Structures are given as structure tokens and as C-alpha cells.
């Protein structure tokens, strides 16, 4: 098992400033980020993550979240693509097949913001990790970070 984690401390941030893009570059060349998460209890968490991705320089951001949040998020963030995932009791239910397909279309994957269901996060990781390229950045947050210990 290889530990690919990198501590993001002040020294690392100084050594890796946010990218400056040429004025003639389009959004497709700036990278696509997939944010997977959300729950009824923390509906704004994925929105904050998507906003951070844009501020860091992403050209396109897609949010995959519970179906009941998809329309409100789409209205709040029209610059994002929003993919509804099935849900049970305000948590992602069985999003693994959809998320695995989406992951192939994106450059960076973020799993877990605003998720509080460790089993759902574990299911997503189990579906993604075997097929995810080691070169593709994967950021884990909240329940996904806790679930990663099982893998």
C-alpha cells in the first residue's frame, strides 16, 4: 500500500501557488473537477467545495449529490453541472456506478464534502479506487476520509 497523501501546510502552499492562466485559455483547458457529496443535513457543503474548485482555477465543475439537492444547487450555481444521485434518508444511496462513469470524464475527483454516511462513502471508494489512475488527483473529505481507512 502506497501512501499518496501530502500534508497541505503553509510551506507547501507557498511552494505551490494557485496557477496563473493565460488570458486566451478557455475553460476546457483549465481542467474538470468532480465533487461528490452532500446530504440533507449539510446542503451547502458541496457548493462551498465547488466554489473553491473554481477559485483554484478549475474550468468546469460537476457536482454529484443527492437528488433532492440537485435542482436547488443547479439554481444556486448555474456555472456547475449537477448530477442527481439516488438517496435514502437524505444521504447518497447507490451512487457508485454513476460516480465511476463521471470520474472517467474529470481530471480531479473530490469525494465526501458534506457527507455524513460512512457506508455510502465506503461504497463510493470501493467502486472508484480499483479503476482510478494513480495519476488522477483524488481529494477525500468528511465521511470519505474516515472510510478510506478501510481500503
Task: Describe these PLM feature segments.
Residues 1-151:
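Small-residue (G/A/S/T)-rich helix-start motifs and N-terminal tracts that mark the onset
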Amino acid at each position: 500500500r502506497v501512501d499518496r497523501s501530502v500534508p497541505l501546510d503553509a510551506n507547501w502552499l507557498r511552494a505551490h501557488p494557485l496557477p496563473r492562466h493565460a488570458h486566451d485559455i478557455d475553460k476546457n483547458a483549465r481542467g474538470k473537477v468532480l465533487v461528490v457529496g452532500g446530504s440533507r443535513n449539510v446542503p451547502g457543503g458541496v457548493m462551498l467545495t465547488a466554489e473553491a474548485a473554481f477559485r483554484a482555477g478549475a474550468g468546469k465543475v460537476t457536482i454529484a449529490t443527492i437528488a433532492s439537492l440537485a435542482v436547488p444547487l443547479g439554481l444556486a450555481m448555474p456555472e456547475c453541472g449537477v448530477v442527481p444521485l439516488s438517496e435514502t434518508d437524505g444521504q447518497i444511496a447507490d451512487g457508485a456506478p454513476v460516480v465511476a462513469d463521471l470520474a472517467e470524464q474529470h481530471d480531479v475527483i473530490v469525494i465526501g464534502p458534506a457527507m455524513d454516511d460512512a457506508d455510502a462513502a465506503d461504497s463510493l471508494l470501493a467502486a472508484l479506487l480499483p479503476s482510478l489512475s494513480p495519476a488522477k488527483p483524488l481529494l477525500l473529505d468528511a465521511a470519505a476520509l474516515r472510510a478510506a481507512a478501510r481500503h
